[in-house]
Amino acid sequence: ALRTTAMQLATVAGPALGGFIYVLRPELPYAVSVVLMVIALACVLALRSRSARTRAAGGGAPDWRSVLAGVAFVRRTPVLLGAITLDLFAVLFGGQISLAPLFARSILHVGTGGLGLLRAAPAAGAVIAGVMLARRPSLRRAGRVLFVVVAAFGATMIVFGVSRSFPLSLAALAVSGFVDMFSMNIRSTIGALATPNELRGRVNAVEMVFISASNQLGAFESGAAAALLGAVPAVVAGGALTIVLAAVWPPLFPALARIDRLEELQPEQTTAPTA
């Protein structure tokens, strides 16, 4: 929760500051982004350099079999497969924040500063949820909570889609970030506790691929749906589909729905039997 909260703090500051910096000079946000990306790239290169030295000291490079072991483990572990795919489709259908520029300009009629606030609102809600989870990390009926917060995420998208009030739209997006933080926390905790130590890195890599794919595909789906249906119907339909997913997933993944306390998860108790 603390790690995700730190990431969300940056997500809050970035869009809000970007909107106001754009007012000063339109090209300035891009210049700032380039500088920050160069710094990030330098950090990544430093990590890769250290990793290369570690392999030279005795560790071998992983082969394809070890890479695919993470995918195979997710496929045969119902709680992991259910949590990851639920997040994938929820973001695919319900992640309508990519349409924020269209809503800011044509529906809410706010400027670049308002757009920055719209983009920052989900992260602001996520920070609040992250602080709450850090203070009280233990959840009862975590599996059911996961489905409830995913349905709530879809409901907030519907509210955002039909809203013509800027404060209401901000509130809807903030609540979407709040409930999405609970979803991310539950999913990431399931991934950590339901996975053996020797597979944890590879399973985490599978999760990251799903997360990245859902974000990018969700943005594409939102734009395509808005072009076909219009912005408001696209957002409302996406939110409704997300609620349907939250209702359909429990019967498909009953092991996920039965989870009570996350800290009680054990890898050997979550793996489906293999033939």
Give short role names for the model-derived ranges:
Residues 1-275:
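Alpha-helical transmembrane-bundle signature of multi-pass membrane transport and export proteins
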